[in-house]
UniProtKB/Swiss-Prot annotation:
Changing D771A: LuxN null phenotype. Wild-type level of light. It is a multi-pass membrane protein. Changing H471Q: Constitutive luminescence. It comes from Vibrio campbellii (strain ATCC BAA-1116). Residues 722-835 form the Response regulatory domain. It catalyses: ATP + protein L-histidine = ADP + protein N-phospho-L-histidine. The chain crosses the membrane at residues 9-29, 41-61, 160-180, 196-216, 220-242, 251-275, 283-301. The phosphatase activity is constitutive and the kinase activity is regulated by the presence or absence of AI-1. At low cell density the kinase activity overrides the phosphatase activity. It is found in: Cell inner membrane. Disulfide bonds: none annotated. The gene is luxN. This is Autoinducer 1 sensor kinase/phosphatase LuxN. Its main location: membrane. InterPro entries: CheY-like_superfamily, HATPase_C_sf, His_kinase_dom, HisK_dim/P_dom, HisK_dim/P_sf, Sig_transdc_His_kin-like_C, Sig_transdc_resp-reg_receiver.
Length: 849
């Protein structure tokens, strides 16, 4: 009677094969579990073929393990012949289902069915294989047994045809997978590469050992190896089916080489000690050897992996290690670290961006927080292609990423698992996919530097606050200074009380504009959430009228260039204070270009819809380049405008979200810019007429400034020098012109660099006072052009810039610098330095007169 004990299977080869069976079974259970999680259909798809293939692999490995145990000699030749035929059929069906699996994949890719001729090959070879293996003497005639792992199988006359069938399946499977690569996406190529790699390892080892060594050479000592290596196909193919994110070939080669080097270090010396020992003593020494390997593995792996990295990448640090080493770089400079990260990821120059959670594409956050940790464009493409149910929910996201050339969106999570920043990357310059190791490394890096990034954001916020207030307050302060100078003149000339009162009122209005600017800037940089502010139903016409009427315009010329909505009113839920600041911000951005674009206007209109209503804020100024229009809602992003915080439009987006809506930008460079403010339709809302006051038809009259024209046209005195004043702000030009009038110097004006070059060409100019930051053409470019025309003409910067780069450019391209707003004494000093003595003396005489 047969007596089974565990000692019968305690052989290294048998244990290896049974361990492989355990791994394959666990993988198969995990695979089925993942399919259930994803609600995948199994029957009629490639999943059914893969599961059948996996079951056959388990049967094949188990049957091979039998030949390396004590069961082989104990049960005898008849049982050995049965297990040999069983192993034949198990291996055949593994190859057959692998082939059918590839047919099913190819059919799904072309959105069709498996070809009839492919089904015919599968059925015919299966029937033939069953026939020759079930009928005695056709494939296995006898098994000569010496002991475990020591046996010889005598093959039958049909064995060669049986192996030809197996080889045919191998070839046809590879043909199917290679054919799938034609006109495939990058993701499909990666999947097929993994499958081909797994199939090649398994099938080639099977072909070489089973065909070469057993059939032709009669050596059965290595028959355990192909079943053990079958795990490679299981894992490679299964991994490719379950995931859409893959490790690069180089990284896999690096890991494999590192492990092989460590194994070589252990095998060579320990093998010399272990092999000469008797079998009983081998088990005694095995325990301390295993302990030694466990203790020293990590240390040796760390040392040898450097050499593996050098052989694979040409550097002792892998790209993953180089990415993780950027942690210290982020602490020194986030911008520099981002540039280095982009270079490591092979992203085009400065295209890798780290934006705050106020980014325009809010649905990025919705997807990231709900069902995935990273958005990868190629993965979305595959989901849309193969999953009909996913098309509705992801088509808009796919289209947005496609239009913005976005390949990767990765979140940074703050407290409460809320998204604080987004890492947004375009496609790689080499058009390759992001590998799994790159994505994992970047995620780890961003997690480590999260606190650094948040601290940097707060520092930038503080700098933006200081810079913006300093820059924006120059114009109101210049206006106050201008009114004081006018007031001084009027007092000296004994002007009537009404005129003096008017000067004081104009000065007070300038101070009020300054206060309003400070309020706007403080709102922009505030961390307070707009969601906490109360909202109420109101007429959108009323809200716009009130916002515009409360804005502090510099003069009535600006007011005359604004058109308010007169038709299609609607009800919106909003907070009037917050809405006012949104309109203030849009007006401020638009009128910044009014001097340089004298024909530009602001037109505010409305449009209603079934689900949302729209307020359209349109200005016909310079427009915005389409390539950067999606960036304008990023924090700290500023376009052709100096001194701003870069936070205004991000603040507008936050406010609109708090109203349940959003703001989007549509622009055409050189033609117009439109901001569309979307408000959700208010259900059961009263008529808009009942929520509004009568139209502010007289708002322009209420806002008209009685501003004194302190800078009238001046008659040119040919005996006096001429100074060209270049500044995009009228109040700054008016102040300088007033001082020049007092000094008896002629003046010409230009509102941007391009205009300055034209005025210089048409007039004789002795000195130029040049602002630095202006639309159309900045002061640096204008100075360079003027110096090419007349190198001797002095150019003095009229600027409040204090940045190191700007000061270096001023020293390089200009002849001096004058603070803005300037003073009479400072201007007199500049005239004395740069105009000839006769000109300076005549100016002084004119002043004394």
């Amino acid at each position: 009677m047969f007596d089974f004990s565990l000692e019968a299977i305690v052989y290294a080869k048998a244990i290896t094969l049974l361990a492989t069976v355990a791994v394959v079974m666990m993988w198969l259970f995990y695979y089925c579990y993942r399919l259930k999680q994803k609600n995948e259909v199994i029957f009629g798809t490639h999943h059914a073929a893969y599961i059948a293939y996996s079951v056959c692999i388990i049967a094949w490995i188990s049957s091979n393990a039998y030949f390396h145990t004590d069961l082989l000699p104990e049960l005898g030749a008849s049982a050995g012949m049965f297990m040999a035929k069983f192993a034949n059929l198990a291996s055949f069906f593994a190859f057959a289902f692998a082939y059918y699996f590839s047919c099913q994949l190819a059919a799904e890719q072309r959105k069709g069915k498996v070809h009839r001729w492919q089904q015919g090959i599968f059925v015919s070879l299966t029937v033939y294989s069953l026939f020759i293996n079930l009928r005695p003497g056709l494939t296995v005639e006898h098994v000569d047994i010496v002991g475990p792992s020591q046996f010889i199988i005598e093959f039958g006359p049909h064995t060669s045809y049986f192996f030809i069938g197996l080889v045919s399946f191998v070839v046809l499977t590879l043909v199917n997978l290679v054919a799938m690569r034609t006109n495939s996406s990058k993701l499909t190529l990666a999947k097929t590469n993994y499958m081909i790699a797994g199939i090649l390892v398994f099938m080639l080892s099977t072909a070489v050992i089973h065909l070469g060594m057993t059939y032709f050479m009669g050596d059965f000592s290595l028959t355990w190896l192909p079943p053990a290596l079958s795990i490679s196909e299981m894992l490679f193919v299964g991994y490719a089916l379950l995931t859409s994110r893959f490790y690069s070939v180089k990284y896999i080669a690096y890991l494999a080489l590192s492990v092989l080097l460590v194994c070589a270090i252990f095998v060579l010396p320990l093998g010399a000690i272990f092999i000469p020992l008797t079998e009983s003593n081998q088990w005694l020494i095995a325990i301390p050897i295993c302990a030694l390997i466990g203790i020293t593995w990590q240390l040796l792996y760390k040392k040898t992996s450097r050499y593996a990295s050098f052989l694979i990448y040409g550097d002792k640090k892998t790209p993953v290690q180089q990415i993780l080493s950027l942690e210290e770089d982020f602490k020194l400079s986030i911008d520099d670290a981002m540039r280095r990260l982009g270079k490591l990821l092979q992203i085009p120059n400065d295209k890798l961006r780290l934006v705050t959670s106020n980014y325009n594409e809010t649905f990025y956050e919705e997807y990231l927080s709900s069902n995935r940790s990273v958005l990868v464009f190629d993965e979305l493409s595959e989901e849309l292609e193969y999953k009909v149910s996913a098309k509705r929910s992801m088509k808009a996201l796919y289209d947005k990423m496609s239009s913005n050339n976005t390949a990767l969106v990765m979140p940074l999570f703050g407290q409460g698992k809320s998204v604080t920043h987004l890492l947004i990357s375009p496609h790689k310059s080499n058009n390759q996919m992001f590998s799994n190791e790159e994505i994992s490394a970047v995620q780890t890096l961003l997690t480590r530097v999260q606190s650094t990034i948040e601290a940097d954001r707060r520092i930038r916020q503080s700098r933006a606050l200081a810079n913006s207030i300093a820059h924006e307050m120059r114009n109101p302060l210049a206006q106050v200074q201008l009114q004081f100078e006018a007031l001084k003149q009027h007092i000296e000339n004994h002007a009537p009380v009404e005129q003096i009162t008017l000067d004081i009122e104009n000065g007070q209005a300038a101070i009020q504009r300054g206060r309003q600017l400070i309020d706007i800037i403080l709102r922009e940089v505030s961390d307070s959430s707009p969601e906490h502010e109360p909202i109420a139903m109101t007429s959108i016409h009323k809200a716009v009228d009130q916002a515009v009427s409360h804005y502090g315009f510099e003069n009535e010329k600006i007011i005359e260039r604004i058109r308010l909505p007169q038709h299609t009113d609607f009800v919106a839920k909003l907070n009037e204070t917050l809405f006012n600041f949104v309109i203030f911000n849009l007006i401020r951005n638009a009128i910044y270009y009014f001097d340089s674009y004298p024909d530009s206007q602001i037109e505010i209109s409305t449009k209603t819809g079934p689900y949302e209503n729209t307020l359209i804020f349109r200005d016909t100024g310079p427009g915005i380049d389409e390539t950067i229009s999606h960036k304008i809602f990023d924090d700290f992003f500023s376009y052709q405008k100096s001194g701003g915080s870069g936070l205004g439009l991000g603040y507008c987006q936050r406010v609109m979200r708090s109203f349940g809506g959003r703001i989007e930008c549509k622009s055409k460079l050189g033609t117009f810019t439109e901001f569309h403010l979307y408000f959700p339709v208010v259900p059961n809302a009263p008529k808009a007429d009942t929520l509004r006051t009568p139209y502010f038809n007289d708002w322009k009259q209420n806002k008209r400034s009685n501003e004194h024209k302190v800078a009238p046209n001046v008659q040119i005195n040919n005996q006096s020098p001429t100074v060209l004043i270049v500044d995009d702000k009228e109040v700054q030009r008016a102040l300088v012109q007033m001082y020049l009038n007092q000094l008896g110097v002629n003046s010409l004006q230009a509102n941007n660099g391009e205009n300055a070059v034209e005025v210089f060409k048409a007039n004789h100019v002795d000195l130029i006072l040049m602002d630095v930051q202006m639309p159309v053409m900045n002061g640096f470019d204008a100075s360079q052009r003027i110096k090419e025309l007349s190198p001797q003409t002095p150019i003095v910067a009229l600027s409040g810039e204090s940045g190191e780069r700007e000061l270096d450019m001023i020293n390089k391209l200009m002849d001096g610098r004058l603070e803005k707003p300037t003073t009479l004494n400072a201007l007199r000093h500049v005239l004395g330095n740069w105009l000839n003595k006769n000109t300076a003396s005549s100016a002084c005489e004119a002043e004394r007169e």
